[in-house]
Amino acid sequence: MRNDPFQRLGLDREVLTVSQLNQRARLLLEDVFPQVWVEGELSNLARPASGHVYFTLKDSNAQIRCALFRQNALRVRQALRDGLAVKVRGKISLFEGRGDYQLIADTVEPAGDGALRLAFEALKEKLAGEGLFASERKRLLPAHPRRIGIVSSPSGAVIRDIISVFRRRAPQVELTLVPTAVQGREAVAQIVRALQLADRQGFDALILARGGGSLEDLWCFNEEAVARAVAACATPIVSAVGHETDVSISDFVADVRAPTPSAAAELLAPNAGDLQQRLDGLRRRLVLRMRDQLLRERLRLEGVARRLRHPGERLRQQAQRLDDLDMRLRRAFERQLAVRHERLVRLETRLAAQHPGRTLALLRQKLDSLAARLPRAAREVLKDRRQRLEGLAQTLNVVSPLATLGRGYSILLDERGRAIRDAGQTQPGQRLKARLAEGELEVRVEDNHRTPVTLSLLD
């Protein structure tokens, strides 16, 4: 029992509650496995509203529950999904409430093909953003190539398949192999050099080919250096890497992607039978067009001949046209004459309505009426003016100083003819003139007294 951990901890003689047992088990696990990397496949992936991620990590024989809390889940760049192979870093712990053994993860990374797939998607997105996959930069393949360069391995079935297709379909095409490694550490550099060399040889087209394999085997065709070398080629290039289900970055950058190397050869190898059928079709189209052209020319010449042989028909047509124009001219003249006559009638009616004799009669009638109304109007005006004059005379008589003098008052004037209004304006012995209602008096001032005038109210 030397290796019994409970004996080392002295737990073989202590009775624990379930909570105590789970707590000590958790502490023991976290102490022994503070950080560990585990590789497996994701399953039972769950994302509750809290933002935490829960999943099961499994292999063919076992599984373990995992928890990835929100702050760590936000740092995971790879989209997690069931079936994804990953590497998980975390600590081994135990959920005390249920006694569940689990891995508390802080990092999740793709494993195996998953890492390669992530790199593949990243490079694909980068090159697409630069426009290397744009359709407008793709070039058409030559319809009848004479010289084709093949960038591939000199050994293996790929080059034999390509040669076989060209021998069968287009033996006249000259094929040149530009050898390169297509797998391994040196493959990327060799493929780049082979593409650059082939692009300088003046080939009509290039084939970049490799047989099938795993993702790791085909990875050199997913390297950025190879992709940029393909994009830099001035020669139209067909990418034929792997089987039909395999897709590489070079497929996206090349002008044309072929599912297999044999399919690439068929794209560039014009079939003799197809060429013969195309020539036959062109010959038939040419014959039909010549027949149509001859028929049109014959009809045109026959029409010209008919016009030349029968000038009388043309004269008859012109005479008929002249008669038609004459009739149209007569009808137009008659319509114009009717319009002018109608307009003349309207003018006569308006002129009769505005005849000077009628106007003079109306004016004379109006003048007689005014002459009859004038004496009566003059009497009314004269009467009104007389009444207004009498009213003004009465008003004037009321405010006239002569009326005041008529009531016994007088006006004193000094030697300059100025009216005396205040006793202070005179001096004793001064001579004044008193104007009465009837006549004037010469008076002399004996004395002057300035006595204020007071008014008293009668009770």
Curated annotation (Swiss-Prot):
Cellular compartment(s): Cytoplasm
Keywords linked to the UniProt accession: Cytoplasm, Exonuclease, Hydrolase, Nuclease
Gene designation per UniProt: xseA
GO cellular component: cytoplasm; exodeoxyribonuclease VII complex
One Gene Ontology term from the biological process aspect of the record: DNA catabolic process
Upper classification of the organism: Bacteria, Pseudomonadati, Pseudomonadota, Gammaproteobacteria, Pseudomonadales
E.C. number: 3.1.11.6
Described function: Bidirectionally degrades single-stranded DNA into large acid-insoluble oligonucleotides, which are then degraded further into small acid-soluble oligonucleotides.
Gene Ontology molecular functions: exodeoxyribonuclease VII activity; nucleic acid binding
Subunit structure: Heterooligomer composed of large and small subunits.
The protein, known as: Exodeoxyribonuclease 7 large subunit
Catalytic activity: Exonucleolytic cleavage in either 5'- to 3'- or 3'- to 5'-direction to yield nucleoside 5'-phosphates
